[in-house]
Amino acid sequence: MSNPRVFFDMSLSGTPIGRIEMELFADTTPNTAENFRALCTGEKGMGKLGKPLHFKGSIFHRVIPGFMCQGGDFTAKNGTGGESIYGAKFKDENFIKKHTGAGILSMANSGPNTNGSQFFICTDKTSWLDGKHVVFGQVVKGLDVVKAIEKVGSDSGKTSKVVTITDCGQLS
């Protein structure tokens, strides 16, 4: 079975800026990859928090240049929420893959075994996160879109424009 590919169509304050295509590492992190894939398609319907389990319409709430772009909080939209397809937080699957450079897709968390729906895309090598955050995919097309998002970030993570996932889904 080949690894699934998913996409985000992105906008900055309502202006479309392009598509990010990502390969999910189902071969090494099947549970984490499946969570992200299903949140891209929205196929699981409503979550326990009463919000659709879907990234569509959610924002990248934290963008730090030279580090990462973080999103996936489709419940509170500020970094305090989110929900996995498994209901609760789920365990760190493994730390086989490393934060080797720009385009790495990894789970955001608040400590060990606290994965939900929040994720980040690295804009540089972030090796200090190895062993703490689960790497489960990589950008295969649209790194220029990630770099455009990075440009509206700040040292505090606050963005100068609203960074929105206007559409998302599975390609293969």
From Swiss-Prot:
Q: Provide the protein's localization.
A: Cytoplasm
- KW Secreted (keyword) present: no
Single GO cellular component term: plant-type vacuole
Q: Name one GO molecular function term.
A: peptidyl-prolyl cis-trans isomerase activity
**PANTHER family according to UniProt:** PEPTIDYL-PROLYL CIS-TRANS ISOMERASE, PEPTIDYL-PROLYL CIS-TRANS ISOMERASE CYP18-4
Q: Which GO terms describe its biological process?
A: protein folding; signal transduction
Tissue expression remark: Ubiquitous, with higher levels in roots and flowers. Confined to vascular tissues. Also detected in stigmas, base of siliques and anthers.
What the entry lists under Gene3D superfamilies is as follows: Cyclophilin-like (2.40.100.10)
Q: How does it assemble?
A: Interacts with A.tumefaciens VirD2.
Task: Explain the regulation of its activity.
Answer: Binds cyclosporin A (CsA). CsA mediates some of its effects via an inhibitory action on PPIase.
Induction of the gene = Down-regulated by salt and cytokinin treatment.
**Per UniProt, what is one Pfam family of this protein?**
Pro_isomerase
Q: Does the keyword Membrane apply?
A: no
Kindly report, in one word, the top-level EC class recorded for this enzyme.
Answer: isomerase
Record domain PPIase cyclophilin-type: where: 7-170
> What is the species of this protein?
Arabidopsis thaliana (Mouse-ear cress)
Q: What is this protein called?
A: Peptidyl-prolyl cis-trans isomerase CYP18-4
Q: What PROSITE patterns would the database entry show?
A: CSA_PPIASE_1, CSA_PPIASE_2
Q: Catalyzes what? A: [protein]-peptidylproline (omega=180) = [protein]-peptidylproline (omega=0)
Q: Using the UniProt record, give the first listed, main subcellular location.
A: cytoplasm
